Amino acid sequence: NASMLGSAMRIDANQQSKLKDNEVRNGYVVFDADKLQQYYDEQIKPNLKLEREDKKVVVNNAGEVLSTETEGHDGIVIADGADTEVGARLAQVLATGTGSVNVDGKVDPKQEVKVTHRVAIDLSDRKLYAYENDTVVKTLNVVVAEGNDNVTGECVGMMCTPTGDFNVWQKLPSQDMSGTLNLADGTVETWDVKDVGFVNYFSSGCAIHRIAGGYVADAVMPSIANGSHGCVGIGWDVAEWFYNWCNMGTSVHIQV
């Protein structure tokens, strides 16, 4: 940098004159090591590094790795004490007209950062909470089984959404759902529903999926009575987000 070099040097016609402690000479040209060091500290040093990016993995409650969000990379920083005399060394190189100035670096190893994805579903308030560690990142309205009371969430019928702790064991972007249930009162319940979207199975035949029967937005879900055979229905406008966020193996807790 020509302007930097100009500000760090002066012309002295008397080659025998006494120099300051921070100065060196090349003929009539005197170089100021302190000014060279200042330029390095302010203009060059801030760019002599590569910021570390940690590897980010998604895990479930058991600590099992479900996916890798970012691979990350090591960082590079200046080695301790490697640049304390850059100004003096550079001044010497300029004074002699030979050599170079090298600054040693060291690796700042990337770390692995674990983020726990988990789902909590409360049947009493009919909400699904998507957690990343201990932070709720999204709250969705849900419609659950017809046997669950719409206010208390208690199982008061023959077809209820199961409670307890589960893991997502199968995911399908779309599925035709059909089945038959022989109920305790002797009746037989059958269904055949086409194109159920964004399906996340967590317990046997029970899944979290886009609510069937046509478009329903998340905001409208609270006005719909419970009516599934055990599945958890979510709004059409949030189903794809949840499907992409919820990995295979994600922990699911369902409570009343």
PLM region descriptions:
Residues 1-177, 182-192, 246, 253-256:
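Surface-exposed, secretory/extracytoplasmic low-complexity segments enriched in Ser/Thr/Asn/Gly/Pro
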Residues 37-38, 47, 51-52, 179-256:
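Exported/periplasmic cell-wall-interacting domains
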